[in-house]
Swiss-Prot record:
Chromosomes assembled in the absence of pds5a and aprin/pds5b proteins have a mild defect in centromere cohesion in vitro. It comes from Xenopus laevis. The lineage of its organism: Eukaryota, Metazoa, Chordata, Craniata, Vertebrata. This is Sister chromatid cohesion protein PDS5 homolog A-B. Residues 1153-1165 have a biased composition (Low complexity). Gene3D superfamilies: Leucine-rich Repeat Variant. One of its GO terms (biological process) is DNA repair. It is found in: Nucleus. Residues 1138-1323 are annotated as: Disordered. GO terms for cellular component: chromatin; nucleus.
Length: 1323
């Protein structure tokens, strides 16, 4: 430091020095000055305030020490000693200082402040004097004298800055306390704290300074705590200036306000009492970035561990929660991130956060939905009970998010929770129970179409649900109890996963086999097709194709790599071998110079899918031992939350599934001995599964394990003769599959069973019929002829054509399986036996198939009561109708029988999908879809789904639509992958279903008046149900192709009745409606189809170009069909809402947009309704046949009549102009009505002639007699339409069932586009 030339000292003659101290002048050396000053310091140090004489004596000396000679002395030791003297002088002369000049006082205190910088070096020899100086100043509060100075603020700021700059970690507690005392006295005893002074304190809280000097931060923190009451108004003023008034110039710290608020809140929330309302104001700022900064700040304040801000300041908390819905994406994102800390530190606030996180879990921004999951999972990982079930439910929902990143995060998060709390048992049983649903949910995701989802589920299964790195026994125990605790859908998904992995293994095996063959064009084509198949099973199939080709090239060049891959996919590969092979193959494919190698990633995906990391011979053996322990009662079943019986049954089911995918792993004495033990158990399901395992895995039993063979044969014989039907089936197939002398074995079963058939004991018939049916199917050459006499003499004449018992007359349309009468069970199996016998023969030389089809048709026409003796119950009739329909469909899968099925028989079969019984419709639709999706049924059977538009139950219609989507997709994909001839294209191209559909609808028994607008509307709905799915995309100009199909039909006649004008008129009318729909859907469809469609000759005659060119629907009808003008509500367009009054209530038909919103349109005038009663069929929610309900509404006539009259009114059917009708069945009346003879109907027609007769619809509920009677338990049904079942009134159904099973009108709410398409059609 440089000082100006030293001024002259004051007159030294008047100065009295302490004894022994010579004069201090500028003539002496610095060392001498220091020596003499030390003695002066000692003198002042020993003086106290009471020494008045000495105070007066040394007053000149005190004034002398304040001269410029001392204050500006260049020697730091001199300055230190002078500062000590001055500090003592202020102590001695307190409360009055000997210096009267304000300028001098300011100069002195600035001088003393500068000397305090010496405190920085604690190792300095002078440190004790510096400490003495600080202690003296703090104890006496010497700086308080400065309050009288006008510009004291400069002194204080300098002091504060000095102290904060010198403090460091080498100072002891005393130094810090004296500094604190010094600054707090100035802060608390002054008139206020200036902004500059406040800045000198607050600057130490800024991160940059805080990191440089932690002690200064701690000192500032303690100072603020001590002076909180005094300094709070100054802090409030500062933040008010910056936050509210926007005066950033008031302080250099303005840009750090939010950091300061955070630090101040952590120090003492009371410092910010007046600031928090200002933050609420800032939260509502129009500036998004400003809101973001405030949200970040408040997130830290609310989320910090010990914060009670949310409780203390509810308005601010509520305002902050509102930012979860901020329009600015970063603000919402920040709010969501905060939630994690809040959940972990403040579980009591979870309830407040839940609703906001729910909304954000559906945020349009992917990043926000992703962070909601991260937030919840992070908290749950710390402690599961920090998150409630609702929050976990949000994560569960996001596993189906449209974005892969979000789905992946949700799935992985749930998997980690499951592993932590269920597998590792952290958190105890309560925690495991809380997340026990996760395993099912994760496996359900395997049903999704995305290959990425499937692969992630496989990865999660291998790493989280059943970790593959566990020891074999532990791994199998984990799998054993997991399988036993899964729900049925999860079990199916897991089975499908193993099936897909096994299928991919077989594809890779076939690819390796192609490598062994000599190169040829055929080989190259086959290899390319196989590579494409493999690529479909990998992520991003487009890119995967290139990688698979590259991998195939590497395989061709590297024989060792091929051999390793062969080991990996060989049936005998162990889990440990698989692990080694995967590592070796990945190492060979890897490129060390390429850190991110997408090719390597793809290869790993492939290897992970095909590697048997869970199951090998050792694993199967461990599973069998676990099951044996369960059988013996020594397992941990109860501890694992599974009953022993459930564990055994699930264990057998698991082994059964694995027997399909890993059959060679079962081949051991120990395994088969255990399975024999299971065969002897009383549990039917266990024995059935055991037989199937033998069937799948026992091909080498006869040669390698003779003792097992000897024990197995008598058991299989016994099961085939006296086991359950399922056991009998599996036993016959097992014998056929694993024994070389199967003809002898099957004959030993066939002969005694065929001789012992007795229709009078139906309870003992089912198993023999099952066994005989399967034997005749598996060995037709040996048993077809003997079976013919059994069929003719027993099955048809004795069993099917006779009713030996009276059915239950409770009126129910369906009953549980266990309540079905033995006779009907036997008849059902007899029908299946007929089908199996024919399927085994695969020819119609004996015309047996024609006879069988006539029999099945007769059963459908008679509605299940083949004898028409009315002894059979309603539910049994439903079972037999279903059996007959399914049998025709099964025979149609065999080409030789499909050719002889007549159009009439096909139509009868189709009408089963509109049966009055819900379960018949449901099961028939499932069987139809299952056969179609495997491409086993001819294309015309897909047209049957068009009739589902008439189904009164929304779920059935939705299921049918999904089936159509799947079938059409599969057919189109098959055509793309497999080039087919034009002839085969007729049976595969989905668009070719249109002519079949048109013909089927033209022969719909409900379609009796081609010009009736209501009937035309129903036809249009059925057409649209199919065409909507077909016309979603105009692939290959398919719209023009379908238009051409319809036009070509109008150039033909109906092959079923070529000379019947009425039949042809109906056909052409349906054609015109179809054209109307196609034109409306594809307005720009002006181009002509390049293909000339070929029509099936079974249904249409040869084209005649000049035959029919006129339009069969009027312009008015066309307009009504397209505009969707309101009409009486039908099941297709109304909400299931019960009437409040017993009188008729009119409904209007919904437009497409209204349908999509589930809105029903009410009311037309009663007068207009009277003219439309014939087509009104209100659909209300209640049980249709107990289990799956469709409520019927009674709609009585306008006049009060007896109940009987109302029944007659409801039983009026459409005019009987349907041709040769046999066994007519009238629409079922409302529950509780008795059968009324035709004569009584005719007598009462006059009583109701004023009211048009309502036309009941097949598969949908007609109007019942009254609302009250709709709740009754029995029902009646009357003949009315050929081969036709119309929906009957409902029977017994509890209120709970009614509510739970309420149905809504047909609609397609899955996408807005669908709704828009419906709107287009109605315009």
């Amino acid at each position: 430091m440089e000082f100006p030339t030293q001024p002259k000292l004051v007159d030294v003659k008047t100065i009295i020095y302490p004894p022994g101290v010579k004069e201090i002048t500028d003539k002496i050396s610095n060392d001498e000055v220091v020596k003499r000053l030390k003695m002066v310091v000692k003198t002042f140090m020993d003086m106290d305030q009471d020494s008045e004489e000495e105070k007066q004596q040394y007053l000149p000396l005190a004034l002398h020490l304040s001269s410029d000679f001392f204050l500006r002395n260049p020697n730091k030791d001199v300055r230190l000693l002078v500062a000590c003297c001055l500090a003592d002088i202020f102590r001695i002369y307190a409360p009055e200082a000997p210096y009267t000049s304000h300028d001098k006082l300011k100069e002195i205190f600035l001088f003393i402040t500068r000397q305090l910088k010496g405190l920085e070096d604690t190792k300095s020899p002078q440190f004790n004097r510096y400490f003495y100086l600080l202690e003296n100043l703090a104890w006496v509060k010497s700086y308080n004298i400065c309050f009288e100075l006008e510009d004291c603020n400069e002194i204080f700021i300098q002091l504060f800055k000095t102290l904060f700059s010198v403090i460091n970690n080498s100072h002891n507690q005393k130094v810090q306390m004296h500094m604190l005392d010094l600054m707090s006295s100035i802060t608390m005893e002054g008139d206020g704290v200036t902004q500059e002074q406040l800045d000198s304190i607050l600057i130490n809280l800024i991160s940059a300074h805080k990191n440089l000097n932690k002690q200064a931060f701690d000192l500032a923190k303690v100072l603020l705590k001590r002076t909180a009451q005094t300094i709070e108004p100054c802090i409030a003023n500062f933040f008010n200036q910056v936050l509210v008034l926007g005066k950033s110039s008031v302080s250099d710290l303005s840009e750090h306000v939010f950091d300061l608020i955070q630090e101040l809140f952590a120090i003492d929330p009371h410092l910010l009492l007046s600031v928090m309302p200002q933050l609420e104001f800032k939260l509502k700022s129009n500036d998004g970035e400003e809101r973001l900064a405030v949200v970040r700040l408040l997130a830290k304040l609310f989320g910090s561990k010990d914060s009670d801000l949310a409780t203390q300041n509810r308005p601010l908390w509520q305002c902050f929660l509102g930012r979860f819905n901020d329009i600015h994406v970063p603000v919402r994102l920040e709010s969501v991130k905060f939630a994690s800390h809040c959940l972990m530190n403040h579980p009591d606030l979870a309830k407040d956060l839940t609703e906001f996180l729910k909304v954000r879990s559906h945020d349009p921004e992917e990043a926000i939905r992703h962070d909601v999951i991260v937030t919840i999972i992070t908290a749950a990982k710390k402690d599961l009970f920090l998150v409630n079930d609702q929050l976990l439910g949000f994560v569960r929902e996001r596993t189906l998010d449209k974005r892969w990143r979000v789905r992946k995060e949700a799935m992985m998060g749930l998997a980690q929770l499951y592993k932590k709390y269920c597998l590792h048992g952290e958190g105890g049983k309560d925690a495991a129970e809380k997340v026990s649903w996760i395993k099912d949910k994760l496996l359900h995701i395997y049903y999704q179409n995305s290959i990425d989802d499937k692969l992630l589920v496989e990865k999660i299964f291998a790493q989280q649900l059943v970790p593959h790195n566990l020891e074999t026994e532990e791994r199998m125990k984990c799998l054993y109890y997991l399988y036993a605790s899964l729900d049925p859908n999860a079990v199916k998904a897991l089975n499908e996963m193993w099936k897909c992995q096994n299928m991919l293994r077989s594809h890779v095996r076939e690819l390796l086999d192609l490598h062994k063959q000599p190169t040829s064009e055929a080989n190259t084509t086959a290899m390319f097709a196989k590579l494409m198949t493999v690529a479909k099973n990998l992520p991003d199939p487009g890119k995967a194709q290139d990688f698979v080709k590259k991998f195939n090239q590497v395989l061709g060049e590297d024989e060792k790599l091929r051999s390793q891959l062969e080991v990996l996919i060989s049936p005998s590969c162990s889990c440990k071998q698989a692990d080694v092979c995967v590592r070796d193959i990945a190492r060979k494919v890897a490129n060390p110079k390429q850190p991110t190698n997408p090719f390597l990633e793809m290869v790993k995906f492939l290897l992970e899918r095909i590697a048997p990391v869970h199951i090998d011979s050792e694993a199967i053996s461990a599973l069998v031992k676990l099951m044996n322990k369960s059988i013996e009662g020594t397992a941990d079943d109860e501890e694992e939350g599974v009953s022993p019986d459930s564990a055994i049954r699930a264990g057998l089911e698991l082994l059964k599934v694995l027997s399909f995918t890993h059959p060679t792993s079962f081949h051991s004495d120990e395994t088969y001995e255990s399975l024999l033990q299971c065969l002897r158990m009383e549990d039917d399901k266990v024995a059935e599964a055991a037989i199937q395992i033998f069937r799948n895995t026992g091909h080498r039993i006869e040669t390698d394990l003779p003792q097992i063979r000897s024990a197995l044969i008598p058991i299989l014989h016994q099961k085939a003769k006296r086991g359950t039907p399922h056991q009998a089936k599996q036993a016959v197939h097992c014998i056929h599959s694993i024994f070389s002398n199967k003809e002898v074995q099957l004959a030993q079963i066939f002969e005694p069973l065929s001789r012992s058939l007795n229709a009078d004991v139906p309870e003992q018939l089912v198993t023999p019929l099952v066994s005989l049916g399967h034997i005749s199917m598996l060995a037709p050459d040996q048993f077809a002829s003997p079976m013919k006499s059994v069929v003719a003499n027993f099955i048809v004449k004795d069993l099917l054509m006779n009713d030996r018992s009276n059915g239950d007359k409770n009126g129910k349309l369906w009953c549980p399986d266990e309540e079905v009468s033995p006779e009907v069970l036997a008849k059902g199996q007899a029908i299946k036996l007929l089908v199996r016998w024919l399927l085994g023969m695969k020819n119609n030389q004996s015309k047996s198939a024609n006879s069988t089809l006539r029999l099945l048709s007769a059963m459908l026409v008679s509605e299940g009561d083949l004898t028409e003796q009315k002894r059979i119950s309603k539910s049994d009739m439903s079972r037999l109708r279903l059996a007959a329909g399914a049998a025709i469909m099964k025979l149609a899968q065999e080409p030789c029988y499909h050719e002889i099925i007549t159009p009439e028989q096909f139509q009868l079969c189709a009408l089963v999908i509109n049966d009055e019984c819900y379960q018949v419709r449901q099961i028939f639709a499932q069987k139809l879809h299952k056969a179609l999706v495997k491409l086993q049924l001819p294309l015309e059977y897909m047209a049957i789904f068009a009739l589902c538009a008439k189904d009164p139950v929304k779920e059935r219609r939705a299921h049918a639509r999904q089936c159509l989507l799947k079938n059409i997709s599969i057919r189109r994909e098959y055509i793309k992958q497999n080039p087919v001839s034009n002839e085969k294209l007729l049976s595969l191209l989905p668009e070719y279903v249109v002519p079949y559909m048109i013909h089927l609808l033209a022969h719909d028994p409900d379609f009796t008046k081609p010009q009736d607008i209501d009937q035309l509307r129903d036809i249009k709905e059925c057409l649209w149900f199919m065409l909507e799915v077909l016309m979603t995309k105009n692939e290959n100009n398919s719209h023009a192709f379908m238009k051409k199909l319809c036009e070509n039909i109008k150039q033909t006649r109906d092959a079923q009745a070529p000379d019947d004008p009425k039949a042809n008129e109906k056909l052409f009318t349906v054609c015109d409606v179809a054209l109307c729909v196609v034109y409306n859907k594809s307005a720009p469809c002006h181009s002509e189809s390049s293909k000339d469609p070929v029509l099936p000759l079974t249904f249409f005659t040869q084209p005649d170009k000049d035959f029919s060119s006129k339009s069969y629907i009027t312009d008015e009808a066309r307009n009504l069909l397209l505009t969707g003008k309101p009409k009486p509500m039908t099941v297709l367009g109304m909400v299931n809402k019960p009437l409040n009054a017993t009188g008729r209530r009119p409904y209007s038909r919904s437009t497409g947009s209204e349908i999509s919103n589930n809105v029903s349109i009410n009311s037309e005038s009663d007068a207009s309704v009277a003219n439309r009663q014939s087509s009104e069929v209100p659909e209300i929610g209640v049980s249709e046949n107990d289990e799956n309900p469709v409520r019927l509404i009674s709609v009585p006539p306008a006049k009060t009549e007896t109940v009987k009259n109302k029944e007659v009114n409801l039983d009026q059917t459409a005019p009987s102009n349907t041709g040769t009708e046999r066994g007519k069945k009238r629409s079922a009346a409302s529950a509780g009505a008795e059968n009324i003879r035709k004569e009584s109907e005719e007598k009462k027609v006059d009583n109701i002639s004023a009211t048009p007769t309502p036309k009941p619809r097949r598969g949908r509920p007609p109007k019942s007699e009254s609302q009250g009677s709709a709740a009754k338990n029995d029902e009646t049904s009357k003949p009315s339409g050929r081969g036709r079942k119309r929906a009957a009134a409902n029977q017994e159904s509890s209120g709970a069932q009614e509510a739970a099973n309420a149905k809504v009108p047909k609609q397609d709410s899955t996408a807005k586009k669908t709704a828009q398409r419906q709107i287009d059609l109605h315009r």
